[in-house]
Amino acid sequence: MLLWRASIPGDWLPKVLADLNGVLVDHCHLERKAATSALNLIKYPELVDHVKELNQIAQEELEHFNLLFDLLKTRGVPFGLPQASPWIGGVMKFIRKGRREQVIDHLIAASLIEGRSCEKFQILAEALKETEPDISKMYANLVESEGGHYSHFWLMA
């Protein structure tokens, strides 16, 4: 577990478990957005030494997207439209203006988003062991990857 100033709200897990299919759709869209974000960071000349690393992260996020998309199809769940995340929107609104600040803040924001995802995936993996073992295993497998993305973005910043 990562150490955060604020923990995940206590009502988060019951809400997720009550609408697991909706959460899977949302997660699928978020993986696509994460891939796009990693690719968008390549535009900054300050990150030229990290282009391959960012490209690798984007590829991994697209693999996660495909994994979730296939899971949705298997479960007969419609893909649906993406939903805005108030938490992610809140993180992104603190990105400062100015080239240097923007680069650093985008990397920190990406790190925070990946880190929180890692924490939530650990909770989901444990909570779904008995009722949804395949999904539990998927989330357990995603923990390492998301944790790696968290640290890569943090170190780039």
In which residue ranges do the predicted regions lie?
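Non-heme di-metal
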Residues: 1-157
